[in-house]
Amino acid sequence: MAKPYEFNWQKEVPSFLQEGAVFDRYEEESFVFEPNCLFKVDEFGFFLTWKSEGKEGQVLECSLINSIRLAAIPKDPKILAALESVGKSENDLEGRILCVCSGTDLVNIGFTYMVAENPEITKQWVEGLRSIIHNFRANNVSPMTCLKKHWMKLAFLTNTSGKIPVRSITRTFASGKTEKVIFQALKELGLPSGKNDEIEPAAFTYEKFYELTQKICPRTDIEDLFKKINGDKTDYLTVDQLVSFLNEHQRDPRLNEILFPFYDAKRAMQIIEMYEPDEELKKKGLISSDGFCRYLMSDENAPVFLDRLELYQEMDHPLAHYFISSSHNTYLTGRQFGGKSSVEMYRQVLLAGCRCVELDCWDGKGEDQEPIITHGKAMCTDILFKDVIQAIKETAFVTSEYPVILSFENHCSKYQQYQMSKYCEDLFGDLLLKQALESHPLEPGRLLPSPNDLKRKILIKNKRLKPEVEKKQLEALKSMMEAGESAAPASILEDDNEEEIESADQEEEAHPEYKFGNELSADDFSHKEAVANSVKKGLVTVEDEQAWMASYKYVGATTNIHPYLSTMINYAQPVKFQGFHVAEERNIHYNMSSFNESVGLGYLKTHAIEFVNYNKRQMSRIYPKGGRVDSSNYMPQIFWNAGCQMVSLNYQTPDLAMQLNQGKFEYNGSCGYLLKPDFMRRPDRTFDPFSETPVDGVIAATCSVQVISGQFLSDKKIGTYVEVDMYGLPTDTIRKEFRTRMVMNNGLNPVYNEESFVFRKVILPDLAVLRIAVYDDNNKLIGQRILPLDGLQAGYRHISLRNEGNKPLSLPTIFCNIVLKTYVPDGFGDIVDALSDPKKFLSITEKRADQLRAMGIETSDIADVPSDTSKNDKKGKANPAKANVTPQSSSELRPTTTAALGSGQEAKKGIELIPQVRIEDLKQMKAYLKHLKKQQKELNSLKKKHAKEHSTMQKLHCTQVDKIVAQYDKEKSTHEKILEKAMKKKGGSNCLEIKKETEIKIQTLTSDHKSKVKEIVAQHTKEWSEMINTHSAEEQEIRDLHLSQQCELLRKLLINAHEQQTQQLKLSHDRESKEMRAHQAKISMENSKAISQDKSIKNKAERERRVRELNSSNTKKFLEERKRLAMKQSKEMDQLKKVQLEHLEFLEKQNEQAKEMQQMVKLEAEMDRRPATVV
């Protein structure tokens, strides 16, 4: 159940304040003296009231009271005489006068003095009044409470007879209704209704006043909303209708459902019980339009989360992690040139929550040699330094306990610096932080202490001496003082240029002042008061001021620091800014630098991210540029976006910048410190304040504001209109675009009923603020309100307005409908809705099942069937095991490794489009075939040569064998012929011996012949075998050569093929990239055209913002697409190279196998070789 936040805005008012006491009252400026006034404070602490006999009742709003203090005895003789006349002599006044300081801004302060009967009463009332003022919670009460407050004010503003004049009531409603209508309404309520009538306070109850407001300015806007909720069917809302309204409209859908539960019937009944005035309806669980109106005007419907007004942030982070409310030239009440300086300004800004004030310190010119504070040589009046220190002491920790930083702009001599140091030490006492905390020593890399560590401490920001110089001078000072030399402080204080602070650490001029080209004389300074008065009275023309400004030049602060003052400087040591990289290298967290707004903007423009990172580590201070002599302010939001801590403003000027500042620092208990967002503190996060896309970890928001109506905007019959602006990051800032129509002649209850003003994309809600401002028909501001977006509540809300000084106005409110939700880019709405509420977005299958059920077919009747896959899926998934065991052809070049899944598969698909190369393909190439032909020709030529040599040797061998055979035959024939002749000659009987002898000779011849044949055959066999071996070797050699040439050629051809593949893939990639760019350009043009033709966009600025946002979104999207494409293409190229490498390795392996095969053939041939010859 949603729980209501208990807003305890009321402070306990002491009983003696409620009972009252008699004081004599006077005012010094206009000489008002009113004796015997009965002063009281109401039970709620809204008003300090007083009334004396025969006088009208008077009130002073406690929200306008800045301080209560004891006052000195007046010096005005008239006042002293008046007090003497009522029996209070000057000698009796000590400790009996209290001063009430009040005002609607920080400059125009009024002082009311109250003289008590005795000092005890004065002391009691000072403490009592101090306990109830500065109630920042009471500045955020609901419209219903504001109505009650106004009713109480009317009851206090009685006439001399103690009754309420009807005229004072008519003034409340004078802006929209005629007096007759008001008189008639009073008559209907049974109250006196004549123009000059009076009403008894007892008869004028709050309920009567509330009914009167409803009669004179009925809330038709809430009535219309009421009818819209119940469908205009009844005069009440049921519990269910109220719950539905609360959850759908009054609750931010982005909130965590556990921490911020939805409303339920029980909570709705609590609301009805609390706000429904009709008891009968309460019993029935119904709420009327009057009860509904009361609820919408209650604290439960505050426009901001009221707990954000408390101290809700962690205060234990380093100082550099906070925005710090800071003032520039705090002492000035007006212009920078010829302006008036005031001690009171220090009190007012500190009481307003400021935590960093500026003191421009100069040597006093009087005989007393007292240091003064003034805007150096800019013709401003002077105030005493010690008076300022006293004022700071009295007010530093009244509204906030967190540390105050005194930003010294030190132009004093060493002697007067010593006086300044002693004043700080003596007046501040333990409040002054003179030494660094033990837990946070002044060492590089050590974090700054937190606001909690420095509670109720005052820090001085001033240049500091080098440690060795400081130590040396302190020792000299100590020894001289111990020696009893009265002039010791003065002697050590003499300015010397030898021991100044390190030049590298001199601060870039933190606050440039003016001086004439020639030094001013004492006479020049004696005229400062007169010049200031002349400027104030308008006697000095703009031309004179410009001429004076032109003759001035800047004077820097002194670098010759007194060692005693130097010892008081710790966590705010200004140094000259030498660059972000230098600061990062030094890593000294207690060093800080100041930048005027122009320099700051320059660094922000060129080094935005570095500036943010610098501010994570150490502090920076921004101050207005010198040209702002009118004390106008720059826009602080720009520097908050960069994480700058001390964004110093001219508090005396309640312009837009100051309104933003005060509206922002109203959060976190108005303590003056706001914790920066997480990504602006963490060193591991990078933040660009000019980013146009959501920050990592931060959810962008959409905010729409519908301005419905206004209430009690003015007591005059004037026209009014409302402006709604947003300030934040440059991309989130929208100003001067959204304004309602002018409603004429009705300052009481104008109804605007405008269409919603939509801030479509707020990328950093943590830094954004909403500003709602009401102007009259002369464009004069009536009221405004600053609402930080991170604490804004959704729904129908009444927004109470503030004046330009951020003081609450009594009754003026704006009734708005605020819608907050997570930003969803165009085109993603359905997806987000489906994710946030899946029930509303059933799947197609579920929808079809519902449709079938509607036709009478039950779910049980529907069989589950396998999902059908596409042919491509089947191809990719069919028989994976079988595919893995299929043998590869030895001639195919395929990768042997398994490709990675996901993007690897995608890359693989890409290269599959490139034709694959096989060995067969390479062998069919023309170059390879030509080379084979050439090799075959060489081999044939060799074989032909070998055949010729075979034939020649064969003929030679045959001839030699034939010759031996012929010689054998011849010799054998000769022996046979000799035998035949001998036989014929001697006869057969006498030839036996000759025959025998002849046979022996023939045998010998045959034997010799065989021996010769055997020798010649052996010789021939040897010659033939050698020739065959030689021929075989030559043929094998040429075959080996040919094989090597073939392998090398195949390798070259494969490399060429790979180069062609690579080139082809590159061309494919270039074509893809070109097509993507063309497609992206087309999309960009179409989107821009759609925006230009979108009739729902009604102003040029919104259209330009949409186009800018679109371009930023498209740029990011397109870069991502190109990045993904580049990654895909890179993977494809890597995959191709991998496959090509595998192909090449495979070819090398095949070539090695071929060579091994060749060697085996050669070895087999050698093993099979036998001696041979040709016969």
Curated annotation (Swiss-Prot):
Positions of the UniProt region annotated as Disordered: 487-512, 860-904, 1082-1110
Modified residues (Phosphothreonine): 886
PI-PLC Y-box domain residues: 565-681
GO cellular component, one term: smooth endoplasmic reticulum
Reactions listed under catalytic activity: a 1,2-diacyl-sn-glycero-3-phospho-(1D-myo-inositol-4,5-bisphosphate) + H2O = 1D-myo-inositol 1,4,5-trisphosphate + a 1,2-diacyl-sn-glycerol + H(+); a 1,2-diacyl-sn-glycero-3-phospho-(1D-myo-inositol) + H2O = 1D-myo-inositol 1-phosphate + a 1,2-diacyl-sn-glycerol + H(+)
Enzyme Commission code: 3.1.4.11
Highest taxon of source: Eukaryota
Cofactor field: Ca(2+)
Domain C2: 684-809
Domain PI-PLC X-box: 313-463
N-acetylalanine: residues bearing it: 2
Bias (Acidic residues) ranges: 493-508
Active-site residues from the entry: 328, 375
One MF annotation (Gene Ontology) recorded for this entry: phosphatidylinositol-4,5-bisphosphate phospholipase C activity
Record-linked PROSITE patterns: C2, PIPLC_X_DOMAIN, PIPLC_Y_DOMAIN
PANTHER family associated with the record: 1-PHOSPHATIDYLINOSITOL 4,5-BISPHOSPHATE PHOSPHODIESTERASE BETA-4, PHOSPHOINOSITIDE-SPECIFIC PHOSPHOLIPASE C FAMILY PROTEIN
Protein name: 1-phosphatidylinositol 4,5-bisphosphate phosphodiesterase beta-4
